[in-house]
């Protein structure tokens, strides 16, 4: 959030300058800066007697005259912005009476209405259910790909950041900054160090979080594979029952999750017939259980 506030001129950097189109952002007038950059923050906007259309129309402020009168072209852009976030059906509703998901879409429509080069969003998926998160991020992705708008946003959900980002910046608690492509940043060992994960694990491949594995002599042997064993692994972990699993190919979709949760995983290299050694090992752990 601090970095974003430097980008949108809410805070001044302790050193250096923020440059946009080769120009210090502090040298832009308010209207010209608003034409370049729009902002969607997490703070709830308090309004009185304003419809959703009225709120979206505020995005035309940089283009209107002293009296703020909208032209037919402005009205067309307001309608387009509402349509782009699938909010035409709530355009005439009182903004203060709509849901959090709808409110976020209206605020995004207002930002779109400014016709900026850059949209900055601070934790836009906070307080949204999974459906509205997907819809919101889909809108942002379409804007970036189809309209060539630069989207800068902060997210706590790293699994979502992994899916939608071209570039990622991670800021560690001690101030260390990691910057790169999702493929460079979202690796299990990097995430473990970044968040100082000591108990449990995060799986970058699936974007899943696993709680700490239970240690001790395995009391259950799970013959999983193909993803069918995952729910059993998590159930056993939930009830604090140590278990072993196998025989699983190392390219099986559940292999990494089994490694995170099982005391012992009996595995084989991809596309190999199970060896006698693996079969004997599996039998041993079945007998132990």
Please report, for each region that a protein language model flagged, where it lies by residue.
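Conserved catalytic motifs of ABC-family nucleotide-binding domains
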Residues: 115
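ABC ATPase nucleotide-binding domains
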Residues: 195-276
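Catalytic Walker B motif of ABC-type/P-loop ATPase nucleotide-binding domains
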Residues: 119-123
């Amino acid at each position: 959030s601090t970095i974003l506030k430097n980008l949108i001129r809410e805070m001044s950097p302790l050193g250096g300058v923020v440059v946009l189109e080769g120009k210090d952002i502090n040298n832009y007038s308010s209207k010209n800066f608003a034409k370049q950059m729009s902002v969607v923050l997490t703070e709830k906007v308090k309004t009185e007697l304003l419809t959703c259309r009225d709120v979206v129309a505020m995005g035309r402020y940089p283009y209107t005259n002293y009296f703020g009168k909208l032209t037919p072209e402005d009205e067309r852009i307001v309608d387009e912005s509402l349509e782009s976030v699938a909010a035409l059906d709530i355009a005439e509703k009182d903004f203060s009476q709509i849901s959090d998901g709808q409110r976020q879409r209206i605020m995004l429509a207002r930002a779109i209405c400014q016709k900026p080069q850059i949209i900055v969003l601070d934790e836009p998926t906070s307080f949204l259910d999974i459906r509205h998160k997907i819809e919101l991020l889909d809108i942002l992705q379409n804007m970036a790909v189809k309209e060539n708008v630069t989207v800068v946003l902060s997210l706590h959900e790293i699994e979502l950041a992994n899916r939608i980002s071209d570039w990622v910046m991670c800021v560690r608690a001690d101030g260390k900054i990691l910057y790169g492509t999702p493929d460079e940043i979202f690796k299990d060992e990097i995430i473990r160090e970044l968040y100082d994960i000591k108990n449990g694990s995060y799986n970058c491949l699936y974007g899943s979080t696993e709680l700490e594995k239970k240690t001790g002599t395995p009391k259950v042997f799970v013959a999983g594979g193909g993803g069918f064993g995952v729910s059993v692994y998590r159930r056993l972990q939930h009830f604090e029952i140590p278990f072993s699993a196998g025989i699983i190919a190392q390219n099986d979709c559940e292999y990494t999750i089994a490694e995170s949760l099982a005391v012992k995983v009996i595995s084989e290299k991809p596309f190999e017939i199970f060896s006698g050694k693996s079969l004997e090992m599996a039998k041993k752990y079945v007998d132990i259980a």
